[in-house]
Amino acid sequence: MYPYTNYHDALFRQPNNLVNDVEKAVNGEYSAINCYSKLANMAKNEEERQRILEIRQDEVKHFQQFQQIYVSLTGRQPQPKIVEECPAAYLNGLEFALKDEQKTVDFYMEIADTATTEHIKEVFRRAAADEQNHAVWFLYYFTKHK
């Protein structure tokens, strides 16, 4: 056996996984932006509406950062698509959002742990911290209205 195949696989697999993960992150943020617009419109009061719009603005920032990373890795613009539909009822939407944010924290930390540059690591670590904060707010509103 020649060990070179393993080195080749190790060298080229990780960046492809990174590209796929960044593309998945772009789509996730794109979906969240769409969903949080709907949730903000269903909010029970102005304070909740404003907080959800602030969360949405964080998602726009993440979306833009992830797009830039995708372009730097591939040389082309991503073609974002909605990958998860937002529930039509407010309470269901809050539950959906808090679960999605929690899963996203883990996903972004995995990307940060395996990323190839410090810039990518830092962007995803910061985004993971933001997502954790978002989950807390969604949990608060979900618990409040349940």
Q: Model-predicted segments: where are they?
A:
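Non-heme di-metal
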Residues: 1-146
